[in-house]
From Swiss-Prot:
Cofactors demanded by this protein: FMN
HAMAP family xref list: DHO_dh_type1 (MF_00224)
Binding site for FMN: 21, 44-45, 125, 163, 214, 240-241, 262-263
Family: Belongs to the dihydroorotate dehydrogenase family. Type 1 subfamily.
InterPro entries, alphabetized: Aldolase_TIM (IPR013785), DHO_dehydrogenase (IPR050074), DHOD_1B (IPR033888), Dihydroorotate_DH_1 (IPR024920), Dihydroorotate_DH_1_2 (IPR012135), Dihydroorotate_DH_cat (IPR005720), Dihydroorotate_DH_CS (IPR001295), Dihydroorotate_DH_I (IPR049622)
Taxon lineage: Archaea, Methanobacteriati, Methanobacteriota, Archaeoglobi, Archaeoglobales
Organism: Archaeoglobus fulgidus (strain ATCC 49558 / DSM 4304 / JCM 9628 / NBRC 100126 / VC-16)
Catalysed reactions listed for this entry: (S)-dihydroorotate + NAD(+) = orotate + NADH + H(+)
Location(s), subcellular: Cytoplasm
GO MF term (any one): dihydroorotate dehydrogenase (NAD+) activity
The protein, known as: Dihydroorotate dehydrogenase B (NAD(+)), catalytic subunit
């Protein structure tokens, strides 16, 4: 028996370790490398049309993680669908979608459902903190967010997940999305922050501010998962600052059925293998499965 197997919204995974959206870019070769050891792969967020994103610098490394403002740079959906036809399918593939309206999200699902028969689901980006009119701006509109979920659930057989931010009333939004039929909630995306170059006296990022990720946001994301577990029935995916198997276990014990790894991949692409092996050793030593540990912090 595989002690790490888990399921979220009908999506069965060999382990609870998912690649978070964005960190590996939009080239399928990079996604295939991660799929060998990951439980699932979430792509970079993509919209209907190609988006150039912000000019450099777009990422800054600081002592507690990363701050990025890439600006949702991505190929057009149709081009990305062609790229993904070379995906090896060693782990379930989910497409991260961003848009500005119900119609845009609907068009995106039409594109990917028709092009990729082996697709396993979608994750709605309702939380990117640095692109006007998309991401967090959509997530702040409860009625629009619910309408997007209802539209997509009415047209695709694939699971639909939503990625939320800790920077707004995530409990209220999660409940609204649950009522709309969402299959799972991922929390949290990056949180707004910035860094200033003391020599020039100017912000380092070209966009001035960006999204903070890495260990600095882990306690915040962990509390979000803990809170949501008490309030919603749909599966929760924890995301934010996970760098060790102990971090993974904390999120699982708080109530997550799976976790996403992002910034840690920046430092080591072997992070999934390392975490997987450590989790296997932990569960075997205690004669338990990952599923046995879900939510035990509430006991």
């Amino acid at each position: 028996m595989n002690p790490l197997e888990t399921e979220i919204g009908g999506l069965r995974m060999k382990n609870p370790l998912m690649l978070a959206s964005g960190i590996m870019g939009s080239k399928v070769h990079s996604l295939n490398l991660i799929a060998r050891d990951a439980g699932a792969v979430v792509t970079k967020s993509v919209g209907v049309e190609e988006r150039e994103g912000y000019r450099n610098p777009t990422v800054v490394n600081w002592k507690c993680g990363l701050i990025n403002a890439v600006g949702l740079a991505s190929p057009a959906a149709k081009d990305f669908a062609e790229e993904l036809k070379d995906y090896t399918n060693e782990a379930p593939l989910l497409i991260s979608l961003y848009g500005h309206s119900v119609e845009e999200f609907s068009d995106l699902v039409d594109t990917f459902d028709s092009a990729l028969p082996y697709l396993h689901g979608y994750e709605l980006n309702l939380s990117c903190p640095h692109v006007k009119g998309a991401g967090l701006d959509i997530g702040m509109d409860l009625e629009l967010s619910a309408a997007i979920v209802e539209e997509l659930k009415g047209k695709t057989k694939n699971p639909v997940f939503a990625k939320l931010s800790a920077m707004h009333d995530y409990l209220k939004l999660a409940k609204v999305l649950e009522d709309a039929g969402v299959d799972g909630i991922t929390i949290s995306n990056t949180l707004r922050g910035m860094k200033i170059d003391i020599m020039s006296g100017k912000p380092v990022l070209s966009n001035l501010s960006g999204g903070v990720s890495g260990p600095a946001i882990k306690p915040i994301a962990l509390k979000c998962v803990y809170d949501l577990y008490k309030e919603i029935e749909v599966p929760i995916v924890g995301c934010g600052g996970i760098t060790s198997f102990e971090d993974v276990l904390e999120f699982i014990m708080a109530g997550a059925r799976a976790v996403q790894i992002g910034s840690a991949v920046y430092y080591s692409r072997r992070i999934f293998y390392s975490l997987k092996e450590s989790l296997i050793a932990f569960t075997r030593a205690r004669d338990c499965t990952i599923s046995d540990l879900i939510g035990i912090a509430h006991s």
